[in-house]
Structures are given as structure tokens and as C-alpha cells.
């Protein structure tokens, strides 16, 4: 699928989110609530794919990042962030839970898009989310595209940073 088609579909979903769920953005519910609603709209636009939130599997294994320390973001520093999504199982790898993914379950060659979301009111963990996107676009996961999405709260504009492979 072409990146421009994907961008148009995601933009449309963000418009629907604003139209139907502005109240959630106004009261600043947690990011998981927002990503769940957004994923519902994304699923409608990608009917031939599975759209999952907080999905931590790669085939039968747990989805992990092993080489992030070698990519200029020290894992020990990440522990200082209060990032709820991390499970520190050992010092060399960590279990990750991408906010939204568009993929085909049990088909690792069909990983289309990983989306990491932050509310505009949340400035913590952006560097980690971007590194997570970059890592998941590499083997073995090989997502074709990545998106870091800063959701505008209380009528602020959304900001999208796209990552092509």
C-alpha cells in the first residue's frame, strides 16, 4: 500500500476521532482510551488488515527490543521515565507494547504501520516512542511505515511525524 494512501486514511480517521470523540480530548482521558477509539476508526479504513492496540506478540514470541542500547538511547535512562508500557524483564531486552499497529496476525511479512501516540499535554517518553518505531521497522518486525502522532488536546492541531522504511 502506498504511503500517501495510508496518510489520507489516517488523516480521515483523525477527523472522525475529532467529530465523534472531542469530549474525550477535552477532558484529557488517558492515551490508551484515545488510541483505542482511533484504532476502531482505523480498522474501518483497513478492512484487510488487523488493527491492534498494545499488541506485544511477534508470531508466538513476546515483542522485544534488544538493540536499543546500541542505538543511542540507554535503557538504564529509560527507567527514569515513568512509562507504564514497559516491563523490564532483563537488562538487555524489554517487552514493548506499541500503541496501535496495522498488520496481519501470524504473517510477519505484512506488518504495515506502527503508530505511537502522545497527547499534546504529555512531554514524557517521546524519544523512546520514536526509537521504538525505528526499531520495529527493522528486522525481524519490518514494519513498512511508522507514525509518531501527537494528538492535539482541546482543539490543538495534531502533529504527525512519518517514518518510511
What are these regions (language model features)?
Residues 98-104, 111-121, 133:
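Conserved catalytic cores of phosphodiester-cleaving nucleases, focusing on short active-site segments
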Residues 43-47, 138:
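A general structural signal for alpha-helical elements within enzymatic catalytic domains
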Residues 16, 57-59, 121:
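Feature marks short, surface-exposed loop/turn motifs that line or immediately flank catalytic pockets
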Residues 138-164:
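Nucleic-acid nuclease catalytic cores
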Amino acid at each position: 500500500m502506498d504511503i500517501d494512501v495510508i496518510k489520507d486514511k489516517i488523516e480521515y480517521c483523525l477527523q472522525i476521532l475529532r467529530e465523534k470523540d472531542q469530549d474525550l480530548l477535552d477532558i484529557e482521558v488517558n492515551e490508551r482510551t484515545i488510541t483505542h477509539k482511533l484504532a476502531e476508526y482505523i480498522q474501518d479504513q483497513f478492512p484487510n488488515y488487523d488493527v491492534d492496540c498494545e499488541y506485544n506478540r511477534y508470531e508466538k514470541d513476546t515483542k522485544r527490543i534488544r538493540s536499543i542500547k546500541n542505538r543511542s538511547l540507554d535503557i538504564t535512562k529509560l527507567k527514569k521515565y515513568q512509562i507504564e508500557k514497559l516491563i523490564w524483564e532483563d537488562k538487555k531486552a524489554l517487552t514493548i507494547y506499541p500503541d496501535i499497529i496495522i498488520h496481519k496476525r501470524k504473517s510477519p511479512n505484512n506488518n504495515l504501520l506502527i503508530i505511537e501516540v502522545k497527547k499534546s499535554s504529555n512531554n514524557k517518553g517521546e524519544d523512546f516512542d520514536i526509537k521504538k518505531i525505528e526499531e520495529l521497522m527493522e528486522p525481524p518486525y519490518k514494519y513498512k511505515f511508522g507514525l509518531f502522532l501527537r494528538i492535539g488536546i482541546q482543539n490543538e492541531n495534531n502533529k504527525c511525524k512519518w517514518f518510511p522504511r
